[in-house]
Amino acid sequence: CFVTSNSFANTPKSSGKYKNWESFTVMTDKGKVCFAQTKPVKRAPAAIKRKDSRIFVTFRPNENVKDEISITSGHAYKNSTVSAKSGKSNFSFFSQGDFAWLLDENEEKKFIKLMKRATDLMIKGKTKDGAETTDHYSMMGFTKAYNTAKKVCS
């Protein structure tokens, strides 16, 4: 499971900003953590109050974790899957609390490939009350932010 930035003892430091994506590094009690993250360019519906939405790709070398993809839509998810779509490619994430993850490393590798070639990504999830939320993300800058996070933690 991804450790949210709120639980870091130290403030994450930017390793580089690349268009819509940014890379960060932070020291935790388990060692260095590096991640690339982005915010959505569009969120709907506006009427639903929620915290920030984000996509993260995380590296935790001391825990042998790489390419861990996590999503938050800024609300606790209903006990259901969260979907990611770009073009004809669809992925399902399992949710727990206010985060969602892919099921295994194989899916993460496929998703990283998609993110490298995609221009945009749409994430759909349901709140605990069953309302659907949709976040639209730009993939512009992803590859550079991803490569920076990976290099800093290798």
What are the language-model segments listed below?
Residues 3-9:
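Sec/Tat signal peptide C-region and signal peptidase I cleavage site
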Residues 9-154:
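A generic "folded-domain core" signal
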